[in-house]
């Protein structure tokens, strides 16, 4: 793509220079980017043109340019007649249509393929003006500038009696139209001090950057021709980059200690349709010389201050040049690509794709096939339980040694825990389970309890037993010394009794769970 853009850049420059579209469409600006804000845009339509037809168009264009050059030496004569080989009447009609279509043709070679590009011609009446017309145009332009300046000052008159503020770090600025522009330090906002407008701190120095001319003096000197100021002395209309704005230069500010002269400031009023009156920015260009930009919708009421509209780019169409033998292959290839587009459009993705990411696919970004793991908070309450051993109705069952090794459990330690549960159960049913919860794994022993043994259950603690043999002694020692009583988790799961007549004692029946922590 970059190579194609570099190849087409000379074509765009040639079109801009040859057609004269710049002068007729908008004001010329050296900062304009031909590629970012193009006056022309190149298209490659899905069409072709025969080689014979392309040669004919280029030849007719060359003859037409020669005829226009010879026309200056034969005034009063009609257009020069083409003296080449005899053509049919249909070809003559096509020739007249082509010459009157307002296009110029250029042959281009791009990546080994020939193209015929049609460039639209844009009329430029400014270059055909005589000297008298140019002088008249300059006079009209001066009158338009004076009119727009008067109109701009009239629109800004509505700002009289109003002030705007701008805060920039330590300094704050106030702009009061027809009065002055001041730089001061504002008091910090607090009780009794509003955040806006900023209140000047009287304990610090403030500076006047510029004062407006006294309107009363202008009225007193209105009849005096020597002191009467013209409109352009008060304000000036400037143009930059196709946009016009009003400029007022103010002096008479506070004396500068470094230069020994009064401070001065240039105020620019720009049209901004989607904004209220506000100070855009202010900066010190040179020592004690400032520039302030004000955006106001008031100037937008005059067409002279409206921002330039972006014109639509003229289309340059480049078609492939094919011979008659290549047409069949080109059409077959085109039908194949159209069929592929239909197939691809019919395939709907399983998950919506946003920025090349399948939303809801549970995949790591940039890593194929990996599932996004849930955080610790998201997995609270989720448990995986597997029965390791249990006693039910006097019969004891447990997992085989191979199954225990799958869970990383030592069969000898499981046998020790089973014996410990037998001692605690005292002939009752019990269950030994392995539980995975919150990213941790542990062994839970559950013993069925009766009402007569509730007090004994409350006094029992949890026995901590690791799964690996290296920490077995540690778990048994904690159980014997009773240190695990503080860390024990004990809960009673109440269940519905099987007896037909529910009683108070039956409702309190349950089971005791003893936790054996599995340190992995």
UniProtKB/Swiss-Prot annotation:
Region called Disordered, residue ranges: 121-144, 442-520
Domain MRH: 161-302
Main location: endoplasmic reticulum
Polar residues bias (residue ranges): 121-135, 461-471
Biased composition (Basic and acidic residues): 473-499
Gene Ontology annotations for the cellular component aspect, listed alphabetically: endoplasmic reticulum lumen; endoplasmic reticulum membrane
Family that this chain belongs to: Belongs to the OS-9 family.
Record note on quaternary structure: Interacts with missfolded ER lumenal proteins.
Protein name: Protein OS-9 homolog
